[in-house]
Amino acid sequence: MSTLLDKTRKLNKILQKSGVEPVVFDDICKILSEVLGCNVYVISRKGKVLGYNFPDGFECSTVKNKIISEMRFPEQYNNKLLNAHETLPNLSNHGICVFEDGTPCDLEDKVTTIVPIIGNRERLGTLLLASFGEKFTDEDLVLGEYSATIVGLEILKSKNDEIEEEARKKAVVQLAIGTLSYSELEAVEHIFNELDGKEGLLVASKIADKVGITRSVIVNALRKFESAGVIESRSLGMKGTHIKILNDKLLDELKKIK
């Protein structure tokens, strides 16, 4: 049997990838499932299944149809998970399915362990372990809590990356807007008022006549936005120009100027 050290080293290999490449939650679930011989789920705070793994023969039809098909746990059950503020080991379902009240469980002697995923003093999700026939040992719980720490670090990293990306996109839009002259800014406001959503067809001459500016002002404004990577434009000849917004912060920043 593998020692605790051997099992921890397997998990460490995943942790060592963090920062170089994104950690896939399914990878953590797979390794933990292999070393503990149990079903493993990584669940977000809102109940979404971020990763899971089942050993052979440990998949029941209810889980497959209700959980895996939607990749989400029922809200009522997820609320129970979130109410666990520390590790709750070896919870028995007493032969009753926890997802279908009163229905007998397909698998006998099921025990569940709930491990909260916490990072930066915030509840980020839950690591759920389900075993059949054998209770989790203290060694298993150590590995479970260690894995929850790895997952928590990765969720925090993903959140930080998302915040940084949002700030970058916002800064790019602000710089692009800053390069426009007053007349070009006026033209841009009318252009995106004409668009239906994130993309659409623009006839520059119609907007020029409507606003009372030259067509060249519109063309220059679009070129500046395109060179900044904020939009993508494609000429369709006499039909006009097809415009697609690439940066989802553009419309929000234009609204602030009005």
Swiss-Prot record:
InterPro entries: CodY, GAF-like_dom_sf, GTP_trans_reg_CodY_C, Transc_reg_CodY_N, WH-like_DNA-bd_sf, WH_DNA-bd_sf. Residues 1-156 are annotated as: GAF domain. Residues 204-223 bind DNA. It comes from the Bacteria. Disulfide bonds: none annotated. One of its GO terms (cellular component) is cytoplasm. GO terms for molecular function: DNA binding; DNA-binding transcription factor activity; GTP binding. GO terms for biological process: negative regulation of DNA-templated transcription. SUPFAM superfamilies: Winged helix' DNA-binding domain. Keywords: Cytoplasm, DNA-binding, Repressor, Transcription, Transcription regulation. It is found in: Cytoplasm. Pfam families: CodY, HTH_CodY. Belongs to the CodY family. DNA-binding global transcriptional regulator which is involved in the adaptive response to starvation and acts by directly or indirectly controlling the expression of numerous genes in response to nutrient availability. During rapid exponential growth, CodY is highly active and represses genes whose products allow adaptation to nutrient depletion. PANTHER family: GLOBAL TRANSCRIPTIONAL REGULATOR CODY, GTP-SENSING TRANSCRIPTIONAL PLEIOTROPIC REPRESSOR CODY. This is Global transcriptional regulator CodY. The gene is codY.
